[in-house]
Amino acid sequence: MRLAPTTVLLWAWGSLQAFEIVEKENIFQRTPCPAFLVFDNTAYLADMSFELPCHCKPEDVSAVVWYYQKYLGSSHTTVLTDFDGRLLTEAAHVRVGSSMLARFSIRMFSLLVFRAQPEDSGLYFCGTRNGDYFYAYDVDIQSHKGMVASFRDKGQEPLPDEYYGSLHVFTTFWEWTPCDRCGVRGEQWRFGLCYLQNPNLSPRYIKTLPDVVSCGSRAVPWKLHLKTKYHTPELLIQSCLVSCKKNKMGEGILAIYNYVSKLGGRPWVPQVPIQFHQQRLGHGLIISCPGARPEHAVAWDKDSQPLYRTQYLKGVNRSMRVFIDHGNHLHIRFTQLSDRGIYYCWRQGLKIAGFRLGVTSRGRYPASLSDPETRTAVELTLIGYLLIAVVFVTIHLCRCCCQSRCCPNFSAQTLLQL
């Protein structure tokens, strides 16, 4: 009978030893660093956030430093490090247009860049404080300006491939997003980024397919890059219809609702949180969906009217006053009284938020340089004064030149009097 406790004890001790072995196992021991530094090519769309893992490092290195170069061999190298304690935990903390030094974070040896811009394209190195590099990336951030949208419901197809001798330029599409709405007709889409195939690419760049890299890769020679600059990213859109998942209302809210209903009044219970905003008549407004990213399936409704991308996507009509940009933001230019209402936001097929917009034509609002309209008015006023000053000085200079030619005895004192 004493063998049973001994057996259990030995089994437990063996399990602890096995657990200790697994605990000490290091992922970097299974991934040796390359003897010759190469660059892993990757591409993203502007305003996206991306992560670059440091796939290998020596076992004795406890912390990594990320470096950035615009071009290989550049004399200017940016050091990306969080040794000063500056960490960005959420992309919501990052403002649009801020410097990359305010949009990155290092977590578990990986570099995270939020809301990437085309200026962030370049080479990223994972290394140490002493400048020893272990792993490197060739990152291509493609701008969504000039993005071509194709609507399958209208029979439109993506852009055809382009051939220039041995150069093959084409579009590589991401996976389809989920349907942006449920219970009603919705839309889904997928982004397409520019890629090329050519046998004369640098062997230092790792390619997913043989001789294939993104169009903005540093492996592409300048002559080939000029031929690809007109092949912009694409957006393919099609209709979809999915059913909604049943969402059970909380027991507490349901009890209050039933109690008030028995008293004779049925209260209005909003399906999603609603935020109120009051806007001045004639001014612009941009509404963002909470927690949404450019790669998410985001939809907008005004009250019960869906705002489909086939009609409201930016670029469909140049004279559009209300449109949705490629970053899933809703723009209202020159707000009118008819814009009053509740604007609902869908994210990944779920309605998550509402914005009640009120438009007022009365009241005085203090001018602020943070207001785009105020900045535009100040800039136009300064430009007007500058033009008037230039014209004034030009007229007087011409007058002085004419008088000096016609009257040789025209003295400098007379010029000063003018």
From Swiss-Prot:
Residues annotated as signal peptide: 1-18
Coiled coil: none
Disulfide bonds: 289-345
SMART domains (alphabetical): IG (SM00409)
Record topological domains on the Extracellular side: 19-376
Domain Ig-like V-type: 267-361
Compartments, as annotated in UniProt: Membrane
Sequence intervals crossing the membrane: 377-397
Matching InterPro entries: FAM187A/B (IPR039311), Ig-like_dom (IPR007110), Ig-like_dom_sf (IPR036179), Ig-like_fold (IPR013783), Ig_sub (IPR003599), Ig_V-set (IPR013106)
Recorded superkingdom: Eukaryota
Disulfide bond is among the record's keywords: yes
Gene Ontology cellular component list: membrane
Family designation: Belongs to the FAM187 family.
Protein name according to UniProt: Ig-like V-type domain-containing protein FAM187A
Species: Rattus norvegicus (Rat)
